[in-house]
UniProtKB/Swiss-Prot annotation:
Name this protein carries in UniProt: Holo-[acyl-carrier-protein] synthase
SUPFAM superfamilies in the cross-refs: 4'-phosphopantetheinyl transferase (SSF56214)
HAMAP family per the UniProt record, alphabetical: AcpS
UniProt key word Lipid metabolism: yes
Species the sequence originates in: Caldicellulosiruptor saccharolyticus (strain ATCC 43494 / DSM 8903 / Tp8T 6331)
E.C. no: 2.7.8.7
Amino acid sequence: MIFNIGIDIVEVERFKNIKRFDSFLKRVFTQKELEYIRSKNFNMLTIAGYFAAKEAVAKALSTGIVFGFKDIEIQKDTNGCPKVKLYNRAKEICENLKITNIVLSISHQNSVAVACAIAEKEE
């Protein structure tokens, strides 16, 4: 059963203009995410897509952002599809709300990245 849906869209240009870019990356992304971003040569579409995904997941949990960005980790499954792994406060919130799965989709094109997250719980 669908608990909630979160959607986020970001302009890629916003990430090109970030001052202290390295600090931003370390503050927002987990070590595994940074490794993936590095493997993509710090592609701005990838960075924007992952950021939008984290925002969409937070919205799907309908709590506002009451946890750190690193509490949400975007991973890839064996087919290259995005999946979500939660830690710390975000994981606790899901357990309290009885959310069993978060389905995630990320898309981007030239100037924007968008993500949609669907939080599911058992009926």
